[in-house]
Regions:
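Short glycine-enriched loops at secondary-structure junctions
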Residues: 64-66, 127-135, 139-140, 178-190, ...
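A substrate-binding/cap region within the structured catalytic cores of diverse enzymes
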Residues: 147-178, 182-214, 218-222
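N-terminal secretory signal peptides that target proteins for export/translocation
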Residues: 1-11
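Mid-to-C-terminal alpha-helical segments outside catalytic/metal-binding sites
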Residues: 361, 366-393
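C-terminal motif of bacterial Sec signal peptides marking the signal peptidase cleavage site
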Residues: 30-31
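N-terminal hydrophobic targeting/anchoring segments and the immediately downstream early-domain regions
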Residues: 34-139, 343, 385
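Second-shell residues forming the walls of enzyme active-site clefts
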Residues: 50, 69-73, 86, 98-118, ...
Length: 393
């Protein structure tokens, strides 16, 4: 009698537990479906757009000046052409750029407000705010101080990384940014690397440590609806040269472990976008640098690592590209390689008509068959899906 009673009680408890588990799983599935549905419901009917407007979404433009008017070329590019976004810089005398976008907090807030007001479809307001040396919102301009990735990696305290990232993100939110071109997940393989290690941009040479700290940085941004971007794929940390100033070949220094932070973070499902490097590696592609390489972007990043989000080029105006390829070739190769969003910093050789000129250029490539309409739809679709998740009210 006692055994039968225990058995009935045991079966009843098991039934209750299984029912609770079933309800929990159904709730989770419903939540996922609701999230997916919510993202989809926010999307405008972009498929009905003209090919010109879809191409415009693929442009992330730089421009000179700390203020804009409705007649400014960037205002026209946003309002009339529908470009996907802008990227803001401070002055960079090292690169000969002395008229950019950031001088003080009040000026910046006004500029970003005016940029957003020009847009019918929400635009990316992007910045390279990595912390430490690579900071556009510098303390001397009146913004809060930040620390570098290398400092955080040396401390190796995830709580410190989280709190530091939270403070940085609060600044981005305060001024209206919605896309931070960070974190850097390059491995600090070459301590004399002029563009990574010497600029204190890497957490570590250890892929696991880089992955862990980058995950904290990403989480800080996501808590405040800021889009992030891993860079520089497939790895710039072993280089001896700087792609801002010339050709960079990592064939003899690059290693497979440089892919591990991407693999780890993509596997966690937290990666919004990935920026390509202008590095050349004959082991990955005997003909083209990563930004222009279908083998690297479509073959490794998408097929091998399983990433189906937005791929962003590093600036196509950098010397590693412009010294070796015409503008037309760079744009065509980048899009066909799998780049969805083209950064055109438009700095040392400023072109006020960069938006309509690039749109017309790509339209002609579509009409001639050099770039397929399907590829444009694929890129625009990824961009709009990302915007719906973070930018749409």
């Amino acid at each position: 009698m006692h055994c039968n009673s225990f058995s009935r009680q045991h079966r009843f408890s098991l039934h209750v537990a299984m029912t609770a588990l079933t309800l929990l799983l159904l709730g989770l599935l419903a939540g996922c479906a609701a999230t997916s549905s919510a993202v989809t419901s926010k999307l405008p009917d972009w498929r009905s757009w003209t090919v010109e407007r879809k191409i415009a979404q693929m442009l992330l433009l730089g421009f000179p000046g700390e203020t804009i008017t409705p007649e400014s070329p960037i205002s026209v590019a946003i309002r009339e052409h529908g470009v996907g976004g802008v990227v803001l810089f401070d002055n960079n005398a090292d690169l000969g750029v002395t008229e950019r976008n950031i001088s003080n907090p009040a000026q910046l807030k006004r500029l970003i407000t005016d940029l957003k007001a020009s847009a019918e479809t929400p635009i990316f307001i992007a910045v390279d705010e990595e912390g430490g040396i690579i900071s556009r919102l510098k303390e001397r301009y009146g913004f809060p101080s930040t620390v570098s990735a290398s400092y955080l990696g040396e401390k190796n305290d995830l709580n410190l990384t989280r709190s530091s990232s939270d403070r940085l993100v609060d600044t981005l939110v305060e001024y209206g940014f919605n896309l931070n071109l960070a974190p850097v997940v390059d491995l600090s393989i070459n301590p004399a690397n002029p563009v990574i290690a010497l600029k204190q941009r890497s957490f570590s040479a250890d892929p696991a440590l880089v992955s862990a700290h980058a995950a904290e940085v990403i989480a800080s941004h996501h808590r405040k609806n800021i889009v992030t971007c891993l860079k520089h794929f497939p790895g710039h940390g072993s280089s001896r040269d700087d792609s801002h100033v010339g050709f960079v070949d990592v064939t003899d220094s690059w290693s497979e472990k440089e892919l591990l932070p991407y693999k780890n973070l993509i596997g966690q499902g937290v990666v919004d976008s990935v920026m390509t490097a202008h590095t050349f590696n004959t082991h990955l592609d005997p003909d083209y640098p990563a930004t222009l390489s279908r083998n690297t972007i479509d073959g490794i990043l998408r097929t091998r690592l399983g990433f189906d989000g937005v791929v962003i080029s590093d600036d196509l105006y950098m010397a590693a590209i412009v010294q070796h390829y015409s503008y037309e070739t760079a744009v065509e190769k980048a899009i066909n390689a799998g780049v969805d969003l083209l950064i055109l910093a438009n700095d040392k050789l400023y072109s006020p008509d960069i938006a309509p000129r690039t749109i017309d250029l790509v339209v002609k490539m579509v009409e001639s068959g050099k770039i397929s309409r399907e590829r444009i739809d694929q890129a625009c679709g990824r961009i709009m899906k990302l915007k719906a998740r973070y930018l749409f009210e």
